[in-house]
């Protein structure tokens, strides 16, 4: 049954799902029109919101571009390629490859979402290289399906924000400790269930041998060696460019800073620390500054989609927040809920909002001020209410192509190649989220 559903979804998506840039443009227009219809905003005020928000994610866009290029450059170093090859060698058949990539991506995203997105896609590509008969789009989809675990992991935006002083709802409910969110029984159940169950779900998505998509071999070719051999009479400038001493000095600075950071902040991994770790590790493993720069240049081609689309989603987010549309959607679901159904209703409201605001932090700003007071009034569990917002966002990412962009950029595929599999994963993983929110 799962195989038939995934084949239907793949055919449907291939026919109807546009490029992610077109998807973002259509969402912009849809948000604009619905906000005019349901809120007292005027066309002029909506245009101003969109324009004011358009550049609000520049810093975040730069962070995401860096995590792609630094992660890609790190994986193209000889030691990391060797590690990925060793891990990928555990898969002997296409079925084992699919299950291994799903498991690997799920665990990696629990550790850190940025790390999981990038390394999961690279691992999927390595499995495709080593296992003949693999369906490459399915393997990349499996890496992205691992993203289902991120919101309940150590880098989940909402549980961390809810426990951080100064967050948007602290004045309403105080701080909500991670013991009530990340380390709660329901979150452990949901996260472990996703890690264990989803490999078996993706296993059943395997296409028939006659339907396996053949991929251009160029996509699976090993990257060229970025090292440069200098002639004996090379000028001082070139010797400096290929100097290992300079790399070691900068690497030592980065390691020293990271040691101080973790000693002060504990296991608080942010996107900035991931980028710094990727950059320093990549620099050291490529050995010379220019070898690393050549690896970065080869990776930079993958960032085009993110650089163009981030401003559109920034504009959509501000329209959702300032027009009150996000609050209206949240209130609709809250008004039909009681104490027992409140977490599930919050989950579905978050999933709907995620189409327009695919950002964990953005969800907390939009939904937190509505969800937390309602949870208090109904006597619902505050920690579960926070995580319901997070779960809705991470669940609907399977139908929202925005966060698939890093994996697709690394893989050299388009969104239509993987989204049929991802939507199938959305349908079956939803049961796990609802059970966890209802029974615990």
Curated annotation (Swiss-Prot):
Coiled coil: none annotated. The chain crosses the membrane at residues 20-40, 54-74, 103-123, 138-158, 159-179, 181-201, 245-265, 266-286, 314-334, 352-372, 395-415, 420-440. Residues 41-53, 124-137, 180, 335-351, 416-419 are cytoplasmic. It is a multi-pass membrane protein. GO terms for cellular component: plasma membrane. Residues 1-19, 75-102, 202-244, 287-313, 373-394 are periplasmic. This is Putative short-chain fatty acid transporter.
